[in-house]
Curated annotation (Swiss-Prot):
GO cellular component: adherens junction; bicellular tight junction; cell leading edge; cytosol; lamellipodium; nucleus; phagocytic cup; plasma membrane
Site feature location: Arginine finger: R312
Chain residue ranges for the region called Interaction with CD2AP: 470-701
Cell location: Cell projection; Cell junction, Tight junction; Cell junction, Adherens junction; Cell projection, Phagocytic cup
Annotated gene: SH3BP1
Source organism per UniProt: Homo sapiens (Human)
Compositionally biased residues, Low complexity: 666-677
Protein's recorded name: SH3 domain-binding protein 1
Gene Ontology process terms (BP): actin filament organization; cell junction assembly; cell migration; establishment of epithelial cell apical/basal polarity; negative regulation of small GTPase mediated signal transduction; phagocytosis, engulfment; positive regulation of GTPase activity; regulation of actin cytoskeleton organization
Domain Rho-GAP: 276-469
Stretches of the chain forming a coiled coil according to its record: none
Motif SH3-binding: where in chain: 616-625
Amino acid sequence: MMKRQLHRMRQLAQTGSLGRTPETAEFLGEDLLQVEQRLEPAKRAAHNIHKRLQACLQGQSGADMDKRVKKLPLMALSTTMAESFKELDPDSSMGKALEMSCAIQNQLARILAEFEMTLERDVLQPLSRLSEEELPAILKHKKSLQKLVSDWNTLKSRLSQATKNSGSSQGLGGSPGSHSHTTMANKVETLKEEEEELKRKVEQCRDEYLADLYHFVTKEDSYANYFIRLLEIQADYHRRSLSSLDTALAELRENHGQADHSPSMTATHFPRVYGVSLATHLQELGREIALPIEACVMMLLSEGMKEEGLFRLAAGASVLKRLKQTMASDPHSLEEFCSDPHAVAGALKSYLRELPEPLMTFDLYDDWMRAASLKEPGARLQALQEVCSRLPPENLSNLRYLMKFLARLAEEQEVNKMTPSNIAIVLGPNLLWPPEKEGDQAQLDAASVSSIQVVGVVEALIQSADTLFPGDINFNVSGLFSAVTLQDTVSDRLASEELPSTAVPTPATTPAPAPAPAPAPAPALASAATKERTESEVPPRPASPKVTRSPPETAAPVEDMARRTKRPAPARPTMPPPQVSGSRSSPPAPPLPPGSGSPGTPQALPRRLVGSSLRAPTVPPPLPPTPPQPARRQSRRSPASPSPASPGPASPSPVSLSNPAQVDLGAATAEGGAPEAISGVPTPPAIPPQPRPRSLASETN
């Protein structure tokens, strides 16, 4: 028994790497040997693929249609959508879309269930039979044949040995009738019978194995059809799913499109302005000049011509975004952006840069570069004029409009610091750039050089705008914006900016109103208290130099300054001011300079009074006896000038009509009443004002 097992192990060790065995090789031809080698790989492939396909199934394997659909994730998604759209308005866009999505998910779940059931029937079950039944049966016959052949070979060896032993015993002189000879002969006969029986079994098993191999060869094509059928089932599943999705999407888009074209939605639909070609934009809106160009130019003409660094300083991103949105949605509501010229300039640059094709066109790029490379000014101007004539009509009209505006902007370069060169640097790359080409570093360097030439082209266009684009231009082409002329804007700016801060002009000669009644003593005391409070709170400053201006030119600035220096009125004092001791005396008044008493000469206003908290008194001030004179500090005990308008004896009150007139003049100018009253009163000869001693001012302060 041990010898037989050892012989069996030796036979298994002699089996080739290709699966060939010496027991079966002698019964198979070369073709059947190759078929035999494909049995084990085919069995492993069928088993592994069946296992992975089974894992791809989403439903319950082997269940009927309804149970399988309930277990699918798509059906769970459909159920969730059905529960969700019940809480929404069924007439809303979201409710309709969710309802349609719920229905299509349910349909897709049923298609998936049908796909899985077909896959199980046509692919999974045949692969399972192949890997679990058919191929294992063939391999089982192979193993049986190998065992029978091995046993047959062993039996033949024993028979051969027994026959040899029987012949050797006869050769040694044993009689044929002896017991040992009889026993050996019986053994040989028994082995021959066993060998013949085993040979018959080997031949029978061999025939069965060969039949299995031939059957496998004939069925091998059908086994390959399992995988073809898998792809067909998948294609049919995806085709049905796609058809259902296309139908649902068409219906959903149709319903959603009707909702978009409803009156409420149409009211909020605005045409695109930025990022659209110039010709398309002008055709859609029926304009001659692009809306962003005209709107930004009109706003800049209104507020931004004197803004320093215009087009160079960047604006806030949020303001710029809101301006661009308002430009497309409601161009009539752009007034709020007029106060931010940098945002308006940024919107104009953004529009020019976002054009699909530059305003000066790609086709004429090389022509612009050649014109800019000319050194002689006359030839360059002629070349630029020729290139301009070749522009499309809509590009030419918009370029002419823009260059006229930029030339107007350059006229204010003393204030806004934007020379034609500076304007060309910031706007040139937005008006012309080369077509995009994939290239090496040399082409990139050439592009940077061309940008410098573009700046030269735009600068020449700005400088020669009147020559290249002759004739006047109406910037308010569409009439959509309020026509604000540059001259009005400049005069308004000058009136508000050129405000003298060191002089009070002579009031305009207007008809004087009726003389006011004589003031009561209380106002005089109030004026004196106000003056003393002002002198005690504010330290003295040296007198400012005079600035001589004609009355018509300076009336408006003074009024504007008085308006800007208004402060809350101080509280009225309830008691008279303290009196200065009589030991103090005033020095003699210096002689007046020639021409200082003329009505047309403005008098200096102390700088400390500008921006102070002084307000006009609530009662009319006393009429001054003399025209305005240079402000001089005066002793508190200096005699007051006699006034014909004040009744009664002259009072030694510190509220005299020299310095108090200076104090009240600035305050009264804020109310607009005092200067006119002063100019209409006859001026009798007056005592010159006495300067206030420096020692007295220091003691008082």
